[in-house]
Each structure stands twice: as structure tokens, then as C-alpha cells.
Amino acid sequence: MRKNESYLNQPAPPIPIPTLSLMGGCREHFENHWKGRARWLMPVIPALWEAKAGRSPEVRSSKPAWPTWRNPIFTKNTKISQVLELFLNYQSLICALEKQKRQKGSLAIFCWSFQGGCVSKRPDVPSLKSQKPKRKRITGRKRLSKGFWSLLFSNLGRF
């Protein structure tokens, strides 16, 4: 027997089983507490049963025996991929709606185009450079141009 398998022959430490009275009497909280534990124990229990029956514990699934849902990097990658998938689905839906609006076809054509993905070109969005710059707002006394003053003084000689 190897050193790694010696832990299988030792008795498990006694763990107090939580009851509804220990959990504050809230059944929902009690069930949520055990859901997390069951998620962690699911890949471990079959290996323990095999070891107890005398067979060699083999890995029969690609699931890791440790809780990957507690690993922050794994969770972050999962969330990013879920958000990206949601974003891409949203973009293809918007694109299909725009295509349907342009074609003005039946609902069957819309469903077909959405399932097939968006191939049509999206309308161009004007860039910021092509827009006219906003005029600077002058506060206080307005400045008059030089042309105004020359015009004013040229007309003063007439009076």
C-alpha cells in the first residue's frame, strides 16, 4: 500500500450534522447549506465506495475532485465566457431584427435568418470626426469683431 492510500483506512473524524434547530429553523437555509456540500462530495463518493469494496479507486469522470466553483480564476473565466456568449447572442438577434426590418418579409424568414446567423452588413455609424465641433460658449460680455468697430467708426463721421 502506498502512502497516498493510507488515508482510506483511517476513520473519518466525527462531524456534527446540522439540524433545523442549529440552522435557525429556516428550511431554505438548511437545504442551501447541504446543496453546496453535495456538489463538492459528488465526484469523491464513488471513489471512496470503490476503495471500500476492495477495488482500486479509478477516476471515471473528467470532473475534478476539488470544488472548482470556489476557485476565483475558474469562476471568473466561466462568468466571462457566459457574458460573451450572451453578448454574441444579443448581437446576432439585433442584427437579424435589422435584417428583417429591411427585408419586410414573413416571420418564417426571420426565424430562418436568426438560426442561420447574421450575414448582412450593419448600417454605418457616423464617426466622431465627421461631426461639427461644438461652438465655444462665451460667458459674460460678448466680444465684438474688428469689422464691427471699423463699421461703427466709419459711420460716426456721417453724423
Curated annotation (Swiss-Prot):
It comes from the Eukaryota. This is Putative uncharacterized protein C8orf44. It comes from Homo sapiens (Human). The gene is C8orf44.
